[in-house]
Amino acid sequence: MIISSSNDYREAAKRRLPPFLFHYIDGGAYAEYTLKRNVEDLSQIALRQRVLNDMSSLSLETKLFNETLSMPVALSPVGLTGMYARRGEVQAAVAADKKGIPFTMSTVSVCPIEEVTPAIKRPMWFQLYVLRDRGFMKNALERAKAAGCSTLVFTVDMPVPGARYRDAHSGMSGPNAAMRRYLQSMMHPQWAWDVGLLGRPHDLGNISKYLGKTTGLEDYISWLGSNFDPSISWKDLEWIREFWDGPMVIKGILDPEDAKDAVRFGADGIVVSNHGGRQLDGVMSSARAMPAIAEAVKGDLTILADSGIRNGLDVVRMLALGADSVMLGRAFIYALAAQGGQGVSNLLDLIDKEMRVAMTLTGAKTIADINESCLVEMNKLIQS
């Protein structure tokens, strides 16, 4: 098929992947209302077209946490990335490195930290959950620091797993899940050969290193399910600071009061995020949450955003709402599943081009120029 947009990568990924993997990344929590709103709310934001502004010196370059980025985009942490392409974390990290943006490794990656960092030149970011097993958390932080990871992305909107009904239907969970996954894999021979066979081991690299034994998909479901910690509080983040002295970003903020708490705690940044609609269905989209959060803490820390961002226009929209940078999750996984690391590179180049078109026709010569003035009737479209 011809691929010319991020939506095309989604369709290509759907063709290539066994259903349990496609629906795991494509789906959300409960009835998936928030998942839909994330995309719809962004798409409804009207950009304000301005012309004849001499845009010949346009630049997408920006700085985050003392790092220079070629554009204000980072790849989000996505669990099981290595199941979407052979050693997928390595391929995605290399693509991000070539583009000059950060790759964020998930706690529950297939490839361990130590496999990914030697493949790239720029430091990657590392994502961590609050888990009951504090020994694992300490071990993961020490290994991330030893591997040269520069920024910690601390996910706080997952004290309990979200209810993802689609997973039970697809075979990721539910009755006879292992058998259903096996049969689906056999019906997708290209994936089964390239990833299912040649992409082994399919264990949870970071967790296996700690436990000292091989882990698999069932361990992913059971170990995480029993280790998420609903007692999480700001005091837990104080404990993290004992083991991490680099930039810390709090991921999963949707309320201005929580954003203010992050400032008081001393966080270097936040990610305005509803976990891609995968946790609590019915909460507002990141786009709707952004203006109030930006008004409350803009300038006090770095504001990133994810959830619903699919293309370069969405990046510009989110920046205009108040974000300093964005993170891509599903979009890069679709590209990775469809064409491996080259697909991720192509997607990032596409987003780059889309941003340049949007900036040229809104009169924003630099990332700093992208603000509320680039939007039409923002209050009516976003805050109503």
From Swiss-Prot:
GO terms for cellular component: plasma membrane. GO terms for biological process: aerobic respiration; lactate metabolic process. It is an enzyme of class 1 (oxidoreductase). GO terms for molecular function: FMN binding; L-lactate dehydrogenase activity. It is found in: Cell inner membrane. Its main location: membrane. Transmembrane segments: none annotated. It catalyses: (S)-lactate + A = pyruvate + AH2. This is L-lactate dehydrogenase. It comes from Acinetobacter baylyi (strain ATCC 33305 / BD413 / ADP1). It comes from the Bacteria. FMN binds at residues 106, 127, 155, 251, 306-330. The keyword NADP does not apply. PROSITE patterns: FMN_HYDROXY_ACID_DH_1, FMN_HYDROXY_ACID_DH_2. SUPFAM superfamilies: FMN-linked oxidoreductases. Keywords: Cell inner membrane, Cell membrane, Flavoprotein, FMN, Membrane, Oxidoreductase. Pfam families: FMN_dh (PF01070). Its EC number is 1.1.-.-. Belongs to the FMN-dependent alpha-hydroxy acid dehydrogenase family. Substrate binds at residues 24, 129, 164, 278. Its cofactor is FMN. Residues 1-380 form the FMN hydroxy acid dehydrogenase domain. The active site is at 275 (proton acceptor). Catalyzes the conversion of L-lactate to pyruvate. Is coupled to the respiratory chain. It is a peripheral membrane protein.
